[in-house]
């Protein structure tokens, strides 16, 4: 994978104090020198079969990192006696676990008990973003896997789609993200879809009024009402690509400026004074958006990580050792 020079320079400049304090680039260069190549090749194969893997892995990485840190706690399967983060409401539709399993199996065959599941998620997400048209960027590695996975943590911590802009900025800010990072991470919705349960109130009964949300384009609201009349309906979060939302670009920001945001928080960032200027910058400059997204992803990947002797290296990403 070709790494763009601007990405390397900016990442070193902006996230060195955050990420490199505990993690390091090329962590597996001696212990498992082919690790990143193995991950990339398997992600490429999956992307060729299903380009929506970009959105799936980005969401998985987000949901893992913001609950107890990037420790692969989201990958743990529940047992008959113990639930896991997979049982949390926000995680019901998280997918991509089979690809992580496939990568882990390949790495265990070549480098047993060496590459953590949390690093696999981070690397696989990076590769999927690039394949989907997003930025290429380097990520430090050396994460270790956690020992705890509870649905209560995810239910309590992960933000709902109707969070306020103030709440969203506070959520990200508590993890070291600024407004540019926060809005850039929401830009991942350029490759996402949402089930009707996350937005149906905006098109049918906004805040109990019996009417659609006035901040939503009325033509879009009508189309979404039809979509949600069918059980199991969903919609592309980027309405510039309503059929195949798999192209990673800044068109999402232009859409929300035209009142075509699907999730409430997406629409709010386009109008709130705290974020609207950033939205305009990203809508006007695709390279700026991609550059900041790369920075934000590396910051996110360093949230509350376990390193050194903390945690473990799972041999099966779905179960503690």
Curated annotation (Swiss-Prot):
Gene3D superfamilies reported for this sequence: 1.10.520.10, Peroxidase, domain 2 (1.10.420.10)
GO biological process: cellular response to hypoxia; hydrogen peroxide catabolic process; response to oxidative stress
Keywords, ordered alphabetically: Calcium, Disulfide bond, Heme, Hydrogen peroxide, Iron, Metal-binding, Oxidoreductase, Peroxidase, Secreted, Signal
A single GO cellular-component term on record: extracellular region
Stored InterPro entries: Haem_peroxidase, Haem_peroxidase_sf, Peroxidase_pln, Secretory_peroxidase
Cofactor(s) in the UniProt record: heme b; Ca(2+)
Domain of life: Eukaryota
Marked site positions, Transition state stabilizer: 59
Disulphide-bridged cysteine pairs: 32-111, 65-70, 117-317, 196-228
Pfam families: peroxidase
UniProt KW Transferase keyword: no
Cofactor annotation remark: Binds 1 heme b (iron(II)-protoporphyrin IX) group per subunit. Binds 2 calcium ions per subunit.
Iron keyword on record: yes
The reaction(s) this protein catalyses: 2 a phenolic donor + H2O2 = 2 a phenolic radical donor + 2 H2O
Catalytic residues (positions): 63
Binding-site list for heme b: 189
Signal peptide limits: 1-21
Subcellular locations according to the entry: Secreted
Protein family per UniProt: Belongs to the peroxidase family. Classical plant (class III) peroxidase subfamily.
Purpose: Removal of H(2)O(2), oxidation of toxic reductants, biosynthesis and degradation of lignin, suberization, auxin catabolism, response to environmental stresses such as wounding, pathogen attack and oxidative stress. These functions might be dependent on each isozyme/isoform in each plant tissue.
Protein known as: Peroxidase 28
Annotated organism of origin: Arabidopsis thaliana
């Amino acid at each position: 994978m070709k790494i763009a020079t601007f990405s390397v320079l900016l990442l070193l400049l902006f996230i060195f104090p955050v990420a490199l304090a505990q993690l390091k680039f090329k962590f597996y260069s001696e212990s498992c020198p082919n690790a990143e190549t193995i991950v990339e090749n398997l992600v490429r194969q999956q992307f060729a079969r299903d380009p929506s893997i970009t959105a799936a892995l980005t969401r998985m990485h987000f949901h893992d990192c913001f609950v107890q840190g990037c420790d692969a706690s989201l990958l743990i399967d529940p047992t008959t006696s113990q639930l896991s983060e997979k049982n949390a409401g926000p995680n019901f539709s998280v997918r991509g676990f089979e690809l992580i399993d496939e990568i882990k199996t390949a790495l265990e065959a070549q480098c047993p008990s060496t590459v953590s599941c949390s690093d696999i998620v981070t690397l696989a997400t990076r590769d999927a973003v690039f394949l989907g048209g997003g930025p290429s960027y380097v990520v430090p590695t050396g994460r270790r896997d956690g020992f705890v996975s509870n649905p209560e943590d995810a239910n309590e911590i992960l933000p709902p789609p109707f969070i306020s802009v103030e709440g969203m900025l506070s959520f990200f800010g508590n993890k070291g993200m600024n407004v540019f990072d926060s809005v850039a991470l929401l830009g991942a919705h350029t490759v996402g879809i949402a089930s009707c349960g996350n937005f149906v109130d905006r098109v049918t009964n906004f805040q109990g009024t019996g009417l659609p949300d006035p901040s939503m384009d009325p033509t879009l609201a009508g189309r979404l009402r039809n979509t949600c009349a069918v059980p199991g309906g969903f919609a592309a979060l980027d309405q510039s690509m309503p059929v195949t939302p798999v192209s990673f670009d800044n068109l999402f920001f232009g859409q929300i400026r035209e009142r075509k945001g699907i999730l409430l928080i997406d629409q709010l960032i386009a109008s709130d004074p705290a974020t609207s200027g950033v939205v305009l910058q990203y809508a006007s400059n695709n390279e700026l958006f991609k550059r900041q997204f790369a920075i934000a992803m590396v910051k996110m990947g360093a949230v509350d990580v376990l390193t050194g002797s903390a945690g473990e290296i799972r041999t099966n990403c779905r179960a503690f050792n």
